[in-house]
């Protein structure tokens, strides 16, 4: 079987969708018999990411990333994020003429634009550079794939995400008279949660999650169950 290395700037102890996706991918790849290694910021000196302190950014990562990959000699390399570790791994792959895949799981340009005056065109230009030589850019949905095609970013391929049926069982339903509309998300500005919370619906709205926007959203939407 193959030796697979996944390098990511988003990793434990962070709790977010990217981390969960990697954890599930690693679990299933190992069940298939592959040797899987994850390189995250916990192996490096790191600092909190501005505006999102749960994310840790590795410092001076290039030399150590090169040494780790030289030691592991992976058969396959997946660069999951566009941060310092991702840039270092991308550089390693180019230097060693190694094929690799990348992923786009966070709307990075929209996230930056929501917090700064940096236009989308600038960050999408960075993404075009970052992903242009990857074999495939793995994306979570057809919508994201279409967006990357529109911006001419790499070769996007849908990486459909499954549901853990040991936890979520839609056949077991609570007896409720009212309809319930549920949104699960980190409560942050780039998630555009007002679009859901402001809808006029024939039932209750439940918001599941936490984050920096929680106080504002609770005050603005007192009828929503958080």
Regions found by a protein language model. Name each.
Residues 99-101, 110-129, 139, 165:
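Nucleotide-sugar donor phosphate/pyrophosphate-binding loop at the beta->alpha transition
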Residues 214-226:
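Nucleotide-activated donor-binding/catalytic signature segment of Leloir-type glycosyltransferases, i.e.
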């Amino acid at each position: 079987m193959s030796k697979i290395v996944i390098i990511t700037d988003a990793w434990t102890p962070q709790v977010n969708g990217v981390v969960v996706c990697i954890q599930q991918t690693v679990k299933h790849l190992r069940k298939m018999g592959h040797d899987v290694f994850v390189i995250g910021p916990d192996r490096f000196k790191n600092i909190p990411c501005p505006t999102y302190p749960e994310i840790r950014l590795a410092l001076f990562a290039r030399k150590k990333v090169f040494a780790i990959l030289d030691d592991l000699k992976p058969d396959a390399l997946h660069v999951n994020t566009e941060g310092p570790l991702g840039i270092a791994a991308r550089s390693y792959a180019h230097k060693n003429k190694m094929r690799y895949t990348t992923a786009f799981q966070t709307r990075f340009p929209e996230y930056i634009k929501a917090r700064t005056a940096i236009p989308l065109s600038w960050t999408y230009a960075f993404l075009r550079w970052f992903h242009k030589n990857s074999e495939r850019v793995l994306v979570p949905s057809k919508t994201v794939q279409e967006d990357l095609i529109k911006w001419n970013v790499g070769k996007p391929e849908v990486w459909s995400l499954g549901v853990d049926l040991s936890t979520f069982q839609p056949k077991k339903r609570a007896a409720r008279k009212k309809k319930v509309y549920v949104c699960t998300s980190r409560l942050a500005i780039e998630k555009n949660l007002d679009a859901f919370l402001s809808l006029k619906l024939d039932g209750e709205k439940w918001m599941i999650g936490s984050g920096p926007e929680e106080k504002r959203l609770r005050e603005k939407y007192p009828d929503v169950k958080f």
